[in-house]
Curated annotation (Swiss-Prot):
Gene3D superfamilies: 1.20.59.20, HUPs
PANTHER family linked to this entry: TRNA(ILE)-LYSIDINE SYNTHASE-RELATED
Residues binding ATP, per UniProt: S26, G27, G28, P29, D30, S31
Localization annotation: Cytoplasm
Species this chain originates from: Clostridium acetobutylicum (strain ATCC 824 / DSM 792 / JCM 1419 / IAM 19013 / LMG 5710 / NBRC 13948 / NRRL B-527 / VKM B-1787 / 2291 / W)
Superkingdom assignment: Bacteria
Catalysed reactions, semicolon-separated: cytidine(34) in tRNA(Ile2) + L-lysine + ATP = lysidine(34) in tRNA(Ile2) + AMP + diphosphate + H(+)
EC number in record: 6.3.4.19
Name of the protein in its database record: tRNA(Ile)-lysidine synthase
Family classification: Belongs to the tRNA(Ile)-lysidine synthase family.
Domain text: The N-terminal region contains the highly conserved SGGXDS motif, predicted to be a P-loop motif involved in ATP binding.
SMART domains cross-referenced by the UniProt entry: TilS_C
Enzyme class: ligase
């Protein structure tokens, strides 16, 4: 079996000479087998290893015994041991997620922490061939694309490694028995409360008995074949993503040209955009991809809500994917501005300079959209900065009647999601300047103007 593990390691370039490896160890057969084998291979690869164990505080005394077992196992082999105790159920309740998901987040965060403390460059996880088969089967049942069928990667992110990924669970259990390792058995793995356990305990044994004795091998081979095809499509999609997508802090704009691509590529472009925004593709299903594609075929202004607090909207054929913002405060924030000083509005990351111009030669009417001039007497003393409110109206320069601010934004082709971010300079409560775009007819300089007001708006650096 050790030779099979070495073959997996070398085939996937998992371990190089002088690597420092954190081994994730629960105390069960898989992780104890992995730790023991990597200990035996220390001299071959000239590696340093440590063990990281998380006590989830779910199974009471049994969890404490798991921790004690792993600690003593490490002491016996003189392996450095790191442990974290955390109430996973409490964290799950606070974050409103399942205990299973909370446990995974906590474990992987701890592995990363130990990686830094141990100055490691690899983290070894004990997934095996049966885990791979169960994962693929579970995703097929739930509904997945090729990305899900490819299963668990032998190497992820260049440093998460799975040396047992091609080893059957039966071989692992035999190794533990032959080496007299006496691993801990997690009783919850025998409960049928989780779908994965039902697949392991009921479905796969049923398929083995009635359809295919080597279903584990068949599912693993399926994963390998799909990985080859999927990796090629991902490579194409990556180049198309760079060509058609523009990333901002909380937004990705997918240009309309992207939607002429084949659906196999387009769906991957969309998934990449989602991953950029929320660092996860969890909960993103085919129906959501289809909704985004449908939104692009609709008229400008069409928008849809998506999982993970995202929204997509059509902006003249381009699709803007963004994180939804709290709109409850839109139009309610208002900031008083003062004459002859730089007004810093730190909350909005803005600096607004206001001063009286005494010499008309100082006026620069052309070339800077962030500096505008107004009749100071018309402006009055009450100057504020705010954002749009429902029912706002504005009289654009050169016109004699008010227009709805909403209609002005539409005519300017300002995306719906950007409209809430445009600062408005107001005099006595009336909009005088849609910053970056238009000034009001009501406060313009004319032949009767005696005092000129200069307002300059900038972003804080």
């Amino acid at each position: 079996m050790i030779n099979d593990v070495i073959n997996t390691i070398e085939k996937n370039s998992m371990i190089k000479q002088n690597d420092r490896i954190v081994v994730a160890v629960s105390g069960g057969p898989d992780s104890i087998c992995l730790l023991h084998i990597l200990f035996k291979l220390k001299d071959k690869f000239n590696t340093s290893i440590c063990a990281a164990h998380v006590n989830h505080c779910i199974r009471g005394e049994a969890a404490d015994k798991d921790e004690e077992y792993v600690k003593k196992f490490c002491e016996k082999l003189d392996i450095q041991f790191y442990v974290k105790r955390v109430d996973v159920n409490k964290i799950a309740h606070e974050k409103k997620i399942s205990s299973e998901m909370a446990g995974r987040e906590i474990r992987y965060a701890f592995f990363e922490e130990v990686k830094e403390r141990f100055k490691a460059n690899k983290i070894a996880i004990a997934h095996n061939a049966n885990d791979q088969a169960e994962t693929i089967m579970m995703r097929i049942i739930r509904g997945t694309g090729t990305e899900g069928i490819k299963g668990i990667r032998p190497v992820r992110d260049g440093y998460y490694i799975r040396p047992l990924i091609e080893i059957r669970r039966s071989s692992i259990e035999k190794y533990c028995e032959d080496e007299k390792l006496m691993p801990r058995i997690d009783a919850t793995n025998l409960e049928r409360d989780y779908n994965r356990n039902k697949i392991r305990l009921d479905l796969i044994p049923y398929i083995v008995k009635n359809f295919n004795e080597d279903i584990v091998g068949a599912l693993n081979r399926l994963g390998e074949l799909v990985t080859i095809d999927n990796d090629y499509l991902e490579k194409l999609a990556k180049s198309k993503y760079k060509l058609y997508c523009n990333e901002c802090e909380k937004q990705v704009i997918i240009s309309k040209e992207a939607f002429s691509n084949d659906t196999a590529i387009l769906s991957r472009i969309i998934r990449r955009a989602v991953f950029y925004l929320v660092n996860s593709k969890y909960n993103l299903e085919k129906k959501h991809i289809d909704s985004i594609i449908g939104c692009q075929k609709n008229t400008t202004g069409k928008q849809i809500n998506l999982p993970n607090n995202m929204r997509a909207y059509n902006n003249y054929g381009d699709i803007c994917l963004r994180i939804k913002e709290d709109e409850s405060c839109i139009g309610k924030k208002e900031y008083n501005l003062h004459m002859d000083k730089l007004n810093s509005v730190h909350e909005e990351n803005l600096i607004i300079g206001i001063r009286l111009i005494h010499n008309s030669k100082d006026i620069r009417l052309e070339g800077n959209k962030n500096v505008k001039y107004f009749d100071a007497d018309k402006a009055g003393k009450y100057i504020t900065l705010r954002y749009r409110s429902e029912g706002d109206k504005f009289m654009p320069f050169g016109m004699k009647n008010n227009k709805k601010l909403k209609d002005i934004f539409i005519n300017l082709k300002i995306p719906r999601e950007e409209r809430n971010k445009i600062p408005l300079i107001c005099f006595g409560g009336e909009i005088a300047w849609i910053t970056g775009f238009k000034i009001s007819e009501k406060f313009k300089i004319d032949n009767n103007t005696k005092k000129i007001l200069e307002i300059k708006i900038e972003r804080e650096e």
